[in-house]
């Protein structure tokens, strides 16, 4: 049996630990989590809580609890992955806990809905380069959007989890993506 826990990759370690304890007590074996939390353009400013501020977000303020996985870097002209404490390291910790509790994660790397950025955020990133008129469905056919997505996946799969010292592509706690 399994469940969906979209917030597992942006909450505190204590919250993640509690989710896994509860899931283990219920006999769950698979948890679907979001491996995407895409935001717009980093402004270089912070809010009153010290979190970075982003513009051109597909989903409200973009970040969730100060966590974001990708943002658009105007200087580079492409999305950049955040592997830090307020980024992919949250997914790393969830994978570590999944293995510790004998579970596996089904990781989504993007979504069609606007929540967490998704395909719509890729369209907004393209607008930053002057590529206009795209819709979410163009994610499947536009070479720029597809290239960015492939770069994201390649970076994730070859990223070494600091908790397990394994690349994501070698993590035994991954059920699927």
Annotate each PLM feature.
Residues 2-177:
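Active-site mouth of glycoside hydrolases
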